[in-house]
A protein has these predicted regions:
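Accessory alpha-helical/coil subdomains and C-terminal extensions
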Residues: 3, 24-133
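Acidic/polar active-site rim loop that often engages polyanionic ligands
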Residues: 7-20, 43-44, 69
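Short gly/pro/ser/thr-enriched loop/turn and capping motifs at secondary-structure boundaries
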Residues: 10-15, 81-83, 111, 140-141
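Catalytic, metal-anchored helix/loop core of enzyme active sites in primary metabolism
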Residues: 139-154, 161-165
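Phosphate-binding loop/pocket of nucleotide- and phosphate-handling active sites
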Residues: 171-208
Length: 208
């Protein structure tokens, strides 16, 4: 048999056995930069923007980028917010004096509707805002790797080679609690990394 050590690479950050995957932090920075630019036009034109990011099965990008970019609401697959609750939250924002808002939507959010259907529902029930949709799409998969990703890739690469030389195989390199670790491949592909519930709580607090 051929010895194999895997290294996790996906922007979705949804692989079990590692806290971070290669590409995730770069995608976060790309998304936050885009939302910051969208915020500029939203603020100057009284607009409500729905920004769709990748994450059909996991909301890591939407949740962390949404918090980092100061989004008013975040819709992710792991939490069923519901359109009525979203509408009420945006109404509260409007009454508090906000002239613009950003809603970050993971492409697999729990509403069962796509971002254009969600935006249409809100626009029909919240006429104050001029509603717009921005789908960031595949730009999230490109770009120059962040410093964090470069350093992590180097650490994982060195550890992977050393693990092979020590006779290990059929395992995946990961990072857990700042330590580089090994997880059996069959265990790594069996499940998905979970959203940090404390981040959901932080998001809920910041949206008030």
């Amino acid at each position: 048999s051929f010895p194999v050590i895997g290294i996790p690479g996906t922007i979705d950050n949804d692989i079990q056995g590692t806290r971070f995957t290669l590409g995730y932090d770069t995608a976060l920075n790309t998304v936050i930069d885009a939302i910051d630019k969208i915020r500029d036009t939203a603020s100057s034109h009284n607009r409500l923007f729905f920004v769709e990011v990748m994450g059909r099965d996991a909301g890591h990008i939407a949740l962390n980028a949404g918090i980092g970019a100061g989004a008013e609401e975040i819709l992710i697959p792991e939490e069923d917010m519901g359109l009525e609750r979203l509408l009420e939250s945006l109404k509260r924002s409007e009454k508090s004096g906000k002239t613009s808002s950003i809603v970050v939507v993971a492409e697999g959010d729990k509403t069962g509707k796509n971002v254009f259907e969600i935006a249409s529902y809100i626009e029909n029930n919240l006429p104050y805002y001029e509603v717009r949709v921005s789908v960031l799409g595949h730009m999230q998969r490109g770009g120059t790797p962040s410093c964090f990703v470069r350093a992590l890739a180097s650490r994982m690469g060195v550890f992977a080679v050393e693990s092979l030389l020590e006779g290990n195989s059929n395992k995946m390199v990961g990072i857990i609690d700042e330590n580089i670790t090994l997880t059996p491949l069959e265990e790594a592909i069996k499940g998905k990394s979970r959203i940090n519930n404390n981040l959901i709580r932080v998001s809920d607090i910041l949206s008030i």
